[in-house]
Amino acid sequence: MANIHIVIPARLKSTRLPNKMLADIAGKPMIQRVYEQVAKSKFDSIIIATDSQKIKDIAESFGAKVVLTRDDHQSGTDRIAEAVTKLGFADEDIVVNVQGDEPLIPIENIEQAAQLLIDKSEAVVSTLCEKITDVEDIYNPNNVKVVFDKNNYALYFSRASIPFERGFSEKEQINISEFFRHIGIYAYRVAFLKHYAELTVSPIEKYEALEQLRVLYNGYKIAIEQSAKSTPAGVDTLQDLEKVRRLFNV
């Protein structure tokens, strides 16, 4: 039976909110909050993959296993691919990528992403989505939208409003029932991860700044389904951080 590991990519120099991995949330750095949330699961191991000695030292101080990676990776998946190679995981194993800025991610969704990849043998990656309930989220580029086929394989991810509803110019007229927000959790087959860094980086990945588009561009399948539980958005801005702080202080 394949082992299932969780890897949390943690980059110190984030663009929109610098040093957010170390941002204080109710007395603990965010990376610790994420680690402690993930530790409630029953997976074989939890590893933090970081390019920062500072994050490494702090993470090890609260008992995390850490892999130090290069600082020139284009995406979290590239960072995880390096970590997986260093850790020597077996090709048949599964790695779940839990973003280091999602301290409120439900454990059920992590388990769901892993099980989906087990069930969908044609896919090399699995991920989750949820229905959009606020029309403003359709036009917010920080909310990545996804469309998928009848067999629950992703067709495209975009920061734009997809699908485009032709003939409707006013937001109030749009039927939002067919719009889905991508949840940034991924499960990968280790054999694929070891190959990921060799794949062609496509123009669409650069335009959208979405690493999962490299998978689709190179002809691989991403399985997707609606999440078991609603997932709060990750921390990308100071406003997001303040919202999470309020939730932890309740």
Curated annotation (Swiss-Prot):
Key word Cytoplasm present: yes
Protein name: 3-deoxy-manno-octulosonate cytidylyltransferase
Primary location group: cytoplasm
Record localization: Cytoplasm
Catalytic activity: 3-deoxy-alpha-D-manno-oct-2-ulosonate + CTP = CMP-3-deoxy-beta-D-manno-octulosonate + diphosphate
Pathway(s) it belongs to: Nucleotide-sugar biosynthesis; CMP-3-deoxy-D-manno-octulosonate biosynthesis; CMP-3-deoxy-D-manno-octulosonate from 3-deoxy-D-manno-octulosonate and CTP: step 1/1; Bacterial outer membrane biogenesis; lipopolysaccharide biosynthesis
Domain of life according to the entry: Bacteria
Any GO BP annotation: lipopolysaccharide biosynthetic process
EC number(s) stated in the UniProt entry for this protein: 2.7.7.38
